[in-house]
């Protein structure tokens, strides 16, 4: 039976990011995934947007993590040579009802410590984006909303983690896990999946 300090279940964006971070320490790490490559499942079909957290529910774990993670991507993408662009986003209000919701959305952003969300008039939005619906009444501009290549990002996380000693066991399922109530090592049982070849 192989001993390791940490087993990460899942080689998607989160699993590979955690593996990369843990690879900086003097611990043994194994990443297990049932797929034949990293970045499968949700990581291969996401929106490729790095959010600021402007519209997350204030006080939630989601808002805390998204707001904290957003500024990290500048260094991560530079270190790993991953395509990344802070292109900003526009939240246009076309109807009167949408327009009336803008102050509440901006207030939510401020409560999430995203202070750079700006109100834009109809004219300002059409100057920024001439192809917007001409019925636009105004909107919000979120300058730090960004785009990234999620496939390259996950691959870069995994390659960096691997180069730093993390072991990846792909096509492997976790078939059991023993948990203890007192602080002590946990045991996991792994099973290699039959090859599809």
Short names for language-model regions:
Residues 1-3:
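A short, basic/flexible loop-to-alpha-helix module at the beginning of a structural domain
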Residues 6-30:
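N-terminal Rossmann-like FAD-binding beta1-loop-alpha1 element of flavoenzymes
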Residues 24-42:
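Glycine-rich FAD pyrophosphate-binding loop
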Residues 27, 114, 166:
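Short phosphate-binding/catalytic loops that engage adenosine nucleotides
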Residues 41-48, 132:
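Short, flexible, mixed-charge acidic loops at enzyme active sites
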Residues 48-128:
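Dinucleotide-binding Rossmann-like beta1-alpha1 core, especially the glycine-rich loop
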Residues 144-178, 182:
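Helical element adjacent to the flavin cofactor pocket in flavoenzyme catalytic cores
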Residues 180-197:
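Single conserved hydrophobic/aromatic residue that forms the stacking wall/gate
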